[in-house]
Amino acid sequence: MTLTASSSSRAVTNSPVVVALDYHNRDDALSFVDKIDPRDCRLKVGKEMFTLFGPQFVRELQQRGFDIFLDLKFHDIPNTAAHAVAAAADLGVWMVNVHASGGARMMTAAREALVPFGKDAPLLIAVTVLTSMEASDLADLGVTLSPADYAERLAALTQKCGLDGVVCSAQEAVRFKQVFGQEFKLVTPGIRPQGSDAGDQRRIMTPEQALAAGVDYMVIGRPVTQSVDPAQTLKAINASLQRSA
């Protein structure tokens, strides 16, 4: 299934599912992608794949009709972060992220860099606390707050800077929706369908639990990419989410 590269031709999906592509081999990744339907999910490209295969790989996914979450977690001086975010927008991605711990000036510069793109600008999301982090990990960094409290502090700063939302754990989603409102988007990794292995994520939920918690976009990796029938797995997840809505 191959569509043209223009953003207007990309398949529209109402699914909250974002499939994390974690492949060492480009052909393996594209082989997987060709088995699934862009109406059933969006795709996340992270640091490893982007470093290996570059912007052209993102374009190949877009040509197949998929919206792309470019998960590079920019964290740099304000000017550099702003230019990086603008480059992602030039690439036509659907979503891009920065680290909230980069501070207010960095996040504000990143947001301002997207103003010239108008309605074609990607969603700009900030990372709060990585889902693999526990209280002991934060303590090692000199942070005495709990992961939940630290994530909320960073989320408040993110909203103050005018970004579209945050990456957070599903456990934080209920409170974040109450505190920051329905328009503030919540993107959550560590989502595993019932019966899946937890992998390296520590704070996990099922898709149905995440939806009930207020998560807007849920990132799912190996339960889909390692499925014998990924297309059917996606359809089953989406059907379950529709029943839960």
From Swiss-Prot:
HAMAP family: OMPdecase_type1_B. InterPro entries: Aldolase_TIM, OMPdecase, OMPdecase_AS, OMPdecase_bac, OMPdeCOase_dom, RibuloseP-bd_barrel. Catalyzes the decarboxylation of orotidine 5'-monophosphate (OMP) to uridine 5'-monophosphate (UMP). Homodimer. Its EC number is 4.1.1.23. The keyword Lyase applies. GO terms for molecular function: orotidine-5'-phosphate decarboxylase activity. It catalyses: orotidine 5'-phosphate + H(+) = UMP + CO2. Keywords: Decarboxylase, Lyase, Pyrimidine biosynthesis. Pathway: Pyrimidine metabolism; UMP biosynthesis via de novo pathway; UMP from orotate: step 2/2. It comes from the Bacteria. Substrate binds at residues 22, 44, 71-80, 131, 192, 201, 221-222. The active site is at 73 (proton donor). One of its GO terms (cellular component) is cytosol. NCBIfam families: PRK00230.1, pyrF. Belongs to the OMP decarboxylase family. Type 1 subfamily. This is Orotidine 5'-phosphate decarboxylase. GO terms for biological process: 'de novo' pyrimidine nucleobase biosynthetic process; 'de novo' UMP biosynthetic process.
